[in-house]
Amino acid sequence: MMKKRQMVIKQRSRNSNTSSSWTTTSSSSSSSEISNVRYVECQKNHAANIGGYAVDGCREFMAAGVEGTVDALRCAACGCHRNFHRKEVDTEVVCEYSPPNA
């Protein structure tokens, strides 16, 4: 009689360039990965042209338009492009594992 076990691994990445990999060494396993992306505080330096540093204080990206339009990439709060907002990626990996027969 084999028992199936389910394991959930959650990881939060603050950098979009961070890559992670999961490996399994079991005889019978399956996994799925779910990623949620959100854009938080704006990091645009509004004083760069005068040699200073000043951000506008926008805390979270809110799309100015519906998905598929140009305004979907512009923040309704600060007017900046979405790329100026820090990207957070929440990744959840769900694995189902059946131990090998002994």
From Swiss-Prot:
Pfam family, one: ZF-HD_dimer
Name of the protein in its database record: Mini zinc finger protein 1
GO biological process, one term: response to abscisic acid
Keyword Metal-binding annotated: yes
Lineage summary: Eukaryota, Viridiplantae, Streptophyta, Embryophyta, Tracheophyta
PROSITE patterns from the UniProt entry: ZF_HD_DIMER (PS51523)
Keyword entries, A-Z: Cytoplasm, Developmental protein, Metal-binding, Transcription, Transcription regulation, Zinc, Zinc-finger
UniProt cross-references to PANTHER family, sorted A to Z: MINI ZINC FINGER PROTEIN 1, ZINC-FINGER HOMEODOMAIN PROTEIN 2
Species this chain originates from: Arabidopsis thaliana (Mouse-ear cress)
Molecular function terms from GO: DNA binding; protein homodimerization activity; transcription cis-regulatory region binding; zinc ion binding
